[in-house]
Amino acid sequence: MKFQYDEFNPNRFEVHRLALDIIEPNSRVLDIGCATGYFAKQLLTKHCETWGVDRDKSAVKKAAKYCQKVIVSNLDEVTSLPVPKKYFDYIIMLDVLEHLLHPENLLSMIKNNLKDNGKVIVSIPNIAHASIRWLLLTGGFEYADTGILDKTHVKFYTKQSSQNLLNKCGYKILDTVPTNGMCKVPLLYKITDRLPVKWQYFIVKKIPTLFAFQFICVARMTRTRIRPAIKK
């Protein structure tokens, strides 16, 4: 896929900032789907060592400026990545899995590259967001160049199904963080846009399955099989 991002979004309750805040300083990070290195650049401010992976050669050339090493790879076709085993504190995949035909293969493959106490950080668009529900209610479902219905997405996830995917691949969910999607809500956005962002996010956290634009799942490897999440 072509990279969509070449700038870091610093907004407090958006995916880039929320994911960055999770990562501890001086960590070793594998950024899968690194694009132009916009996120790796921010990790430098936290004195992290970042390795980048992306299928777009032109993006990887730009990312090399901020990464210890960069790798060009089609994630749907590889069975391993040329990176050290048990090396990384974090493996991040920001808006990556929904572009893959077999995301479970990647999630299983990278476990060997995490330290024993390492974590994966995955962000996935929320197909159950209010804007998509409204489209379905009114008979629409049009793909777009960006967003939840990005035309390059081949998989769609809810909060529950994204957690189930990670569980099935041998991860234990430590946290699931919603991103602010209030500005995308049909009919309500003219009202919610007037609210302070922290108030918007308060509403999102109260009803995340409806108002979160994405979910950021933080997980750790487990040796025991995790049962799929049950909707409550």
What are these regions (language model features)?
Residues V122-A144:
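Conserved class I S-adenosyl-L-methionine
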Residues L107-K119:
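A short glycine-rich, Lys/Arg-flanked "PGG" loop and its adjoining helix->strand segment in the class I
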